[in-house]
Amino acid sequence: MALWGGRFSLAADRRFKQFNDSLRFDYRLAEQDIIGSVAWSRALVTVGVLTVQEQQQLVQALTALLEEVRTDPRSILDSDAEDIHSWVEQQLIGRVGDLGKKLHTGRSRNDQVATDLKLWCKDQGEMLRQALIALQQVLTACARQNQDAVMPGYTHLQRAQPITFAHWCMAYVEMLARDESRLDDALRRLNTSPLGSGALAGTAYPIDRDRLADWLGFSAATRNSLDSVSDRDHVLELLSAAAIGMVHLSRFAEDLIFFNSGEAGFIELSERVTSGSSLMPQKKNPDALELIRGKCGRVQGALSGMLMTLKGLPLAYNKDMQEDKEGLFDALDTWLDCLQMATLALDGLAVKRPRCAEAAQQGYANATELADYLVAKGIPFREAHHIVGEAVVAALAQGKPLEALPLEMLQSFSPVIGADIYPLLALDSCLVKRSARGGVAPQQVAQAIDDAQRRLGNIL
């Protein structure tokens, strides 16, 4: 039986019911709906709608239902209820009779679903937060193990300057830390309770909404009933955080896919996160990483879809807002899955240090060192840049690295070049010189690793 049937003399068309019903996806709010109902029953006692004995009877039934839902949540889908609120009420009436019909007094599905969704977001947000921390920890540990693994850094996918694998790891730690911060900000802003806002104008019962919010674990009650049931900006914020986070994971995956390729050969992925080919027996494909990269698009789509859904809605609640859940559920599930898979992909990853060092020595990644040397000798940088470009062309013509060119040839490009240039062109020197904060110098990378481990230890 629908919760709104008294106004209607005709039954809903079967096709409309299938189109309108949301239980097939909002069943995921069952725990939150029951928890919200327990808190609402307490509020109804304070205004005399329920006696203490009635409330205790309701709580006993709701608690038993909660345990059943936690054991087998998908059993809810066997029902033909319109939505999760209808299902919970039907279950309650089946257990306590007409007393169950009193629970919805003073409450609307509008403030009920807004509350359920915020509670779900808080629960899911904490799981995401832990997954973000776990990935940062694994990256930091990987960085500590590979501080001396020199490899080429890239711009335009061309070798640019030497870095270390540790420095690469710590770059993604920084991105993930910002993802964590964005998530925390979104969770902080959504931490207000809409319950007691009614359909749009507030409840007619003198309920202490701040106390009700506290019972539910919110920091405060919302301040405007119309806003409380009308907006889903907290959904947009979480989707935005997920979209940005997935962009970072997609880039992380792309880097590792390239590093793992035969053309680069910098790393070897574990067989636990790779698969083979049905035709080519030699293949070891980075499927886990490719799926992370591929799933990024669906999260961006969820954000775009929700923006379009909300942009033209008048206040207050509209049925369009039922569309807030499927995209959100899928996006946050996807983000969580990809964070966990990225963490797994790093487990067993082997860095091929000789190959990394060989690649770092190729491609004239030390050309900037020669330019800096010339600047130190008093040559303006733009002129030094031009001189080094000519030297690189000459080295290319001979098929030699810069450090293999004889001093006489280097001096033909600039007489200020002396024999003291050769130690500066070595890979280790290239790294050590980048000693400003955040640079690739070993002491800077070691400091970044220590700082990250200290920060991550403090937030757990």
Swiss-Prot record:
Which pathway does this polypeptide act in?
Amino-acid biosynthesis; L-arginine biosynthesis; L-arginine from L-ornithine and carbamoyl phosphate: step 3/3
Pfam families in alphabetical order:
ASL_C2, Lyase_1
Q: Which PROSITE patterns does the entry mention?
A: FUMARATE_LYASES
Q: What is its main location?
A: cytoplasm
* Alphabetical keyword list: Amino-acid biosynthesis, Arginine biosynthesis, Cytoplasm, Lyase
The keyword Magnesium is annotated on this UniProt entry: no
Q: Tell me yes or no: is Amino-acid biosynthesis among this UniProt entry's keywords.
A: yes
Q: Which GO terms describe its biological process?
A: arginine biosynthetic process via ornithine; L-arginine biosynthetic process
Reactions performed catalytically: 2-(N(omega)-L-arginino)succinate = fumarate + L-arginine
- Reported EC number(s) for this entry are 4.3.2.1
The record's subcellular location field reads: Cytoplasm
Q: Name one GO cellular component term.
A: cytosol
Task: Enumerate the GO terms in the molecular function aspect.
Answer: argininosuccinate lyase activity
Family statement drawn from the similarity comment of this UniProt entry = Belongs to the lyase 1 family. Argininosuccinate lyase subfamily.
Q: Which NCBIfam families match?
A: argH, PRK12308.1
Name of the protein in its database record? Argininosuccinate lyase
To which species is this protein native? Edwardsiella ictaluri (strain 93-146)
| Phylogenetic placement of the source organism | Bacteria, Pseudomonadati, Pseudomonadota, Gammaproteobacteria, Enterobacterales
